[in-house]
C-alpha cells in the first residue's frame, strides 16, 4: 500500500489534465458527480457504476448484541447502512496490481 489518499482536489486535477476543462470547471464537475451519487444514495436508490462498484442502502433490523467487556446483552437499534460492492472488473485489476507488485518485490536468488 502506498498510504496515499485520493481527494476531491486530486480528482479535479486529473480531470483538468486529461479532459482539458479549466480547473474551476473540473472541480465543479467532480462536485456535481459526487453530489448526484450522494443524492441518489440518500433517496435509497442503488448506484451502479459499471466496471467500478455498486453503492446500495440496506435496512438492518433491530437485534441483540453483546458488550464485549461485560457480556451484557444490549439491543442494537434498527438502522440504514450503505454498502459498497466492488465490481469483478475492479477486483481483477486490484489483484493483478497486487500480484505484479509482489513479483517485483520478490528477492532474487543469488547465483551459485
From Swiss-Prot:
Gene Ontology MF, one: structural constituent of chromatin
Cited PROSITE patterns: HISTONE_LIKE
An annotated GO cellular component: cytosol
Record CDD domains: IHF_A (cd13835)
GO biological process, one term: regulation of translation
Highest taxon listed in the record's lineage: Bacteria
Keywords for this protein: DNA recombination, DNA-binding, Transcription, Transcription regulation, Translation regulation
A Pfam entry, by short name: Bac_DNA_binding
Family indicated by similarity: Belongs to the bacterial histone-like protein family.
Quaternary structure (record): Heterodimer of an alpha and a beta chain.
Function: This protein is one of the two subunits of integration host factor, a specific DNA-binding protein that functions in genetic recombination as well as in transcriptional and translational control.
Protein name: Integration host factor subunit alpha
Source organism of this protein record: Rhizobium etli (strain CIAT 652)
Gene label: ihfA
